[in-house]
Amino acid sequence: MDLKHTLRDLCMNPRHTRWVAPLLILGDAVLCALIIWKVPYTEIDWTTYMQQISLYISGERDYTLIKGSTGPLVYPAAHVYIFNILYHLTDEGRDIFLGQILFAILYLATLTVAMTCYRQAGAPPYLLVPLVLSKRLHSVFMLRLFNDGFAAYAMWVSILLFMNKKWTAGAIVWSTGVGIKMTLLLLAPAIAVVLVLSLSLGPSMQLGFLAVLIQVLFGIPFLQNNPAGYVSRAFELTRQFMFKWTVNWRFVGEELFLSRKFSLALLALHILLLGLFVATVWLKPSGSDLPSFLQRLIQRRYRTASLSKSFIMTAMLSSLAIGLLCARSLHYQFFAYLACATPFLLWQAGFHPILVYVVWVAQEWAWNTYPSTNASSLVVILSLAAQVFGVLGNSFSRKHLDQSSQKEHLQ
């Protein structure tokens, strides 16, 4: 009986995360070394990154003319600056082994920040175990060397900064992440709500302007040459994705997948879900409904709210999950953003620990199925839906976010 109680306490008591997390990270570091040693590297985009950087170093500043063997440069300027550094560190991209080591360090840094967020949000230790067991996540970082690793790191650092009320630093890091890959724009709705709740409208708009200014500063070398070309390539919102590479909507069939009606339906669903979350989940700390909140905000009668760390983390990760659920096409590297978010969102959905692990295993299987199938893509959608609608439904049933806040004060 004592053993059962001890094991339960070890798994459920947030106080244990302070020592469980370092042990898991240490074990994962060993696993990373084994993966680099034993599992062959797979070339996908690394060579293209290096070819594009070579053109940049040679003086090319027209984004439309920077290309590689697998296509044109389609990422914002911060991506160029980061991989310019990697280009020089890895002997123009030829030292793949060193590149893998650098990405392993990046992976462990991302994992460390994510676990810190979990601990500060009062999450139980059993949620940390899935964070170190994702085959696809290890692959994205160490075997594929995708730029998503840097964007995911920026995402988690910004979440941690926002959780600790470091608003300006959080906005800077988040905008830097957007400058690596546009995926981080999916967090923008939640960030806007969190900032307005915490700072009111004026200061929030100033931080929004700062985030935009950072993008302009990153892009200056390219904006001076061909501004339209830079914006259209780096921030292209109408890009068409090939059906054969999709991870999420394969089960709907190629004809529907490529149709404009399907694209518009997903956009409408995205807007609807964001509206529901704003009205029912994200505005809860304000103590008022959406019309009253907007009225007080416009009339400058709104009193700022003190947001719990768990609330901020839940808002930002649920905004991410909503965007991924409604995305027309997800590729395997998008798992860099989702992998560490899923256990926390399932917990905030109020799911039993066993169900948390069941959904996590199903999602992991789906994202490791290559090429994707009708079944695996359906599971991708269902697992994302479980996270989104789980958090939404739990906000109606009980004050789970408030309970999480209370746990923080007990730590």
Swiss-Prot record:
Pathway: Protein modification; protein glycosylation. One of its GO terms (cellular component) is endoplasmic reticulum membrane. It comes from the Eukaryota. Keywords: Endoplasmic reticulum, Glycosyltransferase, Membrane, Transferase, Transmembrane, Transmembrane helix. Its main location: endoplasmic reticulum. PANTHER family: DOL-P-MAN:MAN(5)GLCNAC(2)-PP-DOL ALPHA-1,3-MANNOSYLTRANSFERASE, NOT56 - RELATED. This is Dol-P-Man:Man(5)GlcNAc(2)-PP-Dol alpha-1,3-mannosyltransferase. It comes from Neosartorya fischeri (strain ATCC 1020 / DSM 3700 / CBS 544.65 / FGSC A1164 / JCM 1740 / NRRL 181 / WB 181) (Aspergillus fischerianus).
